Design a protein with these regions (language model features):
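Short coil/linker segments at helix-helix boundaries
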Residues: 55-77, 123-138
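Proline-centered turn/helix-capping motifs that create local helix->coil transitions or kinks
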Residues: 49-58, 154, 186
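An aromatic- and glycine-enriched ligand-binding surface/loop that stacks and positions planar moieties
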Residues: 1, 81, 85, 89-90, ...
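Conserved, well-structured interaction surfaces
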Residues: 1-53, 69-82, 87-101
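Aromatic-lined, polymer-binding surfaces characteristic
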Residues: 46, 55, 59, 100-111
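Active-site-proximal beta-strand/loop segments in catalytic clefts of secreted hydrolases
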Residues: 22, 61, 180-182
Length: 189
């Protein structure tokens, strides 16, 4: 399609462009941290594509608009999902675990891994596709790590905590894993 429909790959190109040029950074810790964030977003990008289209081509390097790779066939769902897990594992192992409401952290990557693995495991199970156990096991492992170690808790303050959680003008830091802040005066997120 020429517009809409979710077939836009600009975002992936930006991520792959960053990853192909990040090797220039001499600070290895910073590079690995930001490479982890880039790979988190690539995993999320591909998760959205797989949910919408199923099998799609996997690109993990920067391509030009004339690259013949752009016209190759789709990769298998197994291949794509394994690559998504590779990206998330890298992200989990390299992104800072310092709690930060407005930036991707180790905990954000762990939560995304849990969500993606739950989706893929149940999709495979209820569509009769083999291999669902791997994804459900990965989901359980990631979820257990998150529940046991993440610096988050269920918001229980106030007379109606569930309502207050969603009606507050500020993000409730104890429960929110990743947020976007909206500034009404400037009309920006």
């Amino acid at each position: 399609p020429t517009s809409g429909g979710g077939w836009n790959w600009e975002y992936l190109r930006a991520v792959n462009f960053y990853l192909s040029h990040s090797v220039r950074c001499d600070d290895v810790d910073a590079r690995e941290h930001f490479d982890g964030i880039a790979r988190f977003f690539r995993a999320y990008f591909y998760f959205e594509k797989v949910k919408r289209f199923g099998e799609v081509p996997w690109f993990d390097r920067e391509l030009s608009s004339t690259d013949p790779e752009l016209f190759r066939p789709r990769d298998s769902r197994d291949f794509i999902m394994d690559k998504i897990l590779d990206d998330l594992t890298y992200a989990i192992n390299n992104i800072s675990d310092k709690k930060d409401l407005y930036n991707v952290t180790h905990w954000t990557a762990l939560a995304l891994k849990s969500r993606i693995c739950l989706f893929e495991g149940t999709y495979r199970k209820y569509h009769g596709i083999p291999g669902y156990e791997k994804f459900l096991d990965e989901c359980a492992t990631a979820s257990k790590l998150f529940i046991d170690n993440a610096p988050y808790a269920i918001y229980k303050t106030g007379a109606q905590p569930y309502r207050d959680l969603f009606s507050s003008m500020n993000a409730i830091e104890e429960e929110v894993i990743l947020a976007r802040d909206y500034d009404r005066a400037q009309n920006v997120m």
